[in-house]
Amino acid sequence: AIGSGRASIPYIRAIRRYSEGSTFTVILQDPRTGPRVADLIWVPEHDRLRGPNVIVTVTSPHSYSPERLARLRRELPPEIEALPHPRVAVVLGGKNGSYKFTDADDDRLATALESIGRLGASFMITPSRRTHSRLLRVADNATQNRPRILWDGTGENPYPYFLAAADWLVVTADSVNMTGEACATGRPVYVFEPSRGSSKFRYFHQRLQGIGATRPLPPVVEQLESWSYAPIDSAAIIAREVERRYLLRFGRTT
């Protein structure tokens, strides 16, 4: 049985109690109750929980496996296929409890995007639910003279295809999930850092920079730097560890 977050804890406890230990239980995210609440717990590395039954990864699990991204690349919509290289995916977040996104922050991002456009890039831009109107507007203005697709919130979000088609990616630092998904591509990821932040976010981004997946977005991009790294697929790492520990406990089944 697999649960996610604190809301799943009563159900996990009930399953353990009524199955009398015959069910292997897993919780994703820190349950804030200590590590004994389940047989196995996954937390991101920037969280503090540790224990013999706790596994950690740098990024969170997501659905963008190498196989899925390869399939998406083979099935690109014509409007994305038509965009000239280099294609730059711009993934916009917004204000949260850690990052402020001042007007000056918005303008800094716009200046960086304008400089990327001058290098001949095309753009694939998608906002998130937290993206404030001014940030989207300045990103729109900064890229309007280049070939681009800017998702306006209507219809299905082409975000999965943007990840698959991108030669480079620009992601705002406020979302661990968006940054982790960008790093599933194995392509260069520039991270834009708004005002404030927190120690957890700083640790997370420093770790990704340390393993060579991301770099800070320069105020003015004079060239699109190339670097490579193994695509980061934490879901596969977690799944293998769940299977390994399950088999250690219950043995192989036929």
Predicted feature residues:
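Short N-terminal targeting/anchoring amphipathic segment
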Residues: 1-6
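A donor-sugar binding/catalytic signature common to diverse glycosyltransferases
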Residues: 159-201
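Catalytic donor nucleotide-activated moiety binding site of glycosyltransferases and closely related
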Residues: 120-155
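Glycosyltransferases and closely related glycan-assembly transferases
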Residues: 10-26
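A nucleotide-sugar donor-handling region in carbohydrate enzymes
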Residues: 35-102, 217, 221-232, 236
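Short, charged/polar "capping" segments at the starts of alpha-helices
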Residues: 34-35, 50, 98-99, 131-137, ...
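Leloir-type glycosyltransferase catalytic cores
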Residues: 206-254
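Conserved catalytic-core segment of nucleotide-activated headgroup transferases in glycan assembly
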Residues: 85-86, 95-127, 131-132
